[in-house]
Amino acid sequence: MRKIALLALAAILFVACSPNREKHLEQIAAFEERITESPISAANPETADSLTDLYVSFADKFEKDSLAPVFLLKAGEVQSNVLHTEHAVEIFDRLIEDYPDFEDLPMCYYLKANAYDMNSQYEEAKAAYEFFVSKYPNHFMARAAQVSLDHLGMSPEEMLADILAHADDTIIAQNSEMI
């Protein structure tokens, strides 16, 4: 009798929690859709904070859900895009700590480095990019991380001049590999 009562209680809790999860997912989807329809609002820090709150709230409530790390990654990206670097890094660090087996963990490390870079925190960016490149040398973003490292702290004009100055060398090297 006790087992049946426990099973019934578990079933009730499962059913009670499921709509909450679905409701939360619907709220996230609706918010994301509104932002997609109005890209200007996506750059608004208040809008970014609201969306981040939804993502983080989902991860808090459903930490074992496979979408929890996905939403944390999105939350970190959103905060990074509005230059809330400290908050972005906190979220990325939480993701790294809580979900070490997350399939997109390398992207989390890259985005963390990029958040520092975008906020002109070059020492932190350098360390984070170097970590990423050494840990994930074959990741599709490794080349971008190396380019960012090579141009860390440069103005856009300086970066362009450096890239153009080395463009001929790159083309010659690529052509010699073909021969």
Locate predicted features.
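Sec-dependent bacterial lipoprotein signal peptides
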Residues: M1-C17
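Acidic, polar-rich low-complexity tracts and alpha-helical solenoid repeat scaffolds
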Residues: A16-I179
